[in-house]
A protein has these predicted regions:
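Beta-strand-turn-beta hairpins that frame and shape the catalytic cleft
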Residues: 1-4, 99-110, 169, 224-229
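N-terminal active-site segment of His-dependent metallophosphoesterases
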Residues: 1-64, 70-79, 137-140
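Active-site neighborhood of phospho(di)ester-bond hydrolases with catalytic His/Asp-centered motifs
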Residues: 5-7, 32-37, 63-68, 93-97, ...
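Active-site environment of divalent metal-dependent phosphoester hydrolases
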Residues: 10-16, 40-44, 69-79, 99-102, ...
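Short amphipathic alpha-helices and their capping/turn segments at secondary-structure boundaries
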Residues: 20-24, 51-56, 93-105, 109, ...
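Hydrophobic alpha-helical segments and helix pairs
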Residues: 78-134
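Binuclear metal-dependent phosphoesterase catalytic core
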Residues: 102, 184, 191-210, 218-254
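Active-site-proximal loop/helix segment associated with metal-binding centers of metalloenzymes
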Residues: 109-171, 176-187
Length: 254
């Protein structure tokens, strides 16, 4: 099976939509995994975007893992639950904390895996990062404690899904970055890193996970941690020229 993957397409921006219209993904996979930040699911135009028609026609199955931007139309995170899904086309679905079987011997574990913000960095992070103005938790704006609560929920789901898996091949797909080993040196020491990255390196190294697909950082850094290949294929912001390392046909073959 060929599992194609990409993330951070940011179709909410005209520059990104135009770029992908003229430079479409190369449909070389059986399944397409999109690891977050594709568009705003609360926008009335989200499901109408022509990208979904194209993706539906070119892949047997399209799996979307929501990133933080998916919730930027004041989506209420409190409405999410393990196994939540949103059908976009007949074979295109967005999943939150869900295990998706791919054939008889492959499982894809899909979770946003929010990162984790330390108390000392919380004030500045809430002041700077748009998540805390554009996402809700109940009737209140998202704050760092709820952000961290979602991290714990996602990680607990992930641990249980991995422990319970009988699959020969386990693939994890998250939006947030699962280790500082995957962080670009330019961000080292930033007090905003807690909104992007969480250190799970020891967990990954001890796990049976074969591949871990991630996004969010707009920097594509691949690294083997233990026996797990951590891979990323983010388009990023075209208007900021972040798309240079994007590969229109990146695949995992199993």
């Amino acid at each position: 099976m060929r599992i194609q993957y990409a993330s951070d397409l940011h179709l909410e921006f005209s520059e990104n939509s135009s770029y992908l219209k003229h430079n479409p993904l190369l449909a070389v996979g059986d399944v397409l995994v999109l690891a977050g930040d594709i568009g705003y699911i609360g926008d009335d135009n989200y499901s109408k975007h022509p990208f979904w028609d194209w993706a539906s026609q070119n892949y047997e199955q399209v799996i979307v893992i929501p990133g933080n931007h998916e919730f930027y139309k004041l989506f209420d995170l409190n409405k999410l639950y393990n196994g939540w899904s949103l059908k976009i086309r007949e074979n295109v679905t967005c999943y939150y904390n869900t295990v998706i079987p791919l054939g008889n011997d492959i499982e894809l574990i899909a979770t946003t895996l929010w990162a984790h913000i330390s108390l000392q960095d919380a004030y500045r992070t809430e002041s700077v990062i748009s998540d805390f103005r554009r996402i809700r938790y109940g009737v209140e704006p998202l704050d760092f404690t709820r952000f961290n609560d979602e991290h714990y929920r996602c990680f607990k789901f992930l641990e249980e899904a991995v422990n319970n898996s009988k699959a020969k091949h386990i693939i994890v797909a998250t939006h947030h970055v699962p280790s500082f080993e995957l962080m670009s040196p330019e961000f080292k020491g930033s007090d905003l890193n807690g909104a992007f990255t969480v250190e799970l390196g020891d967990y990954i190294a001890a796990s049976p996970i074969e591949y871990w697909i991630y996004g969010h950082s707009h920097r594509n850094i691949d690294k083997v941690i233990g026996n797990t290949s951590c891979v990323s294929n983010q388009l990023g912001y075209v208007f900021s020229n972040e798309h240079g390392s994007f590969d229109r046909g990146r695949c995992i073959e199993l």
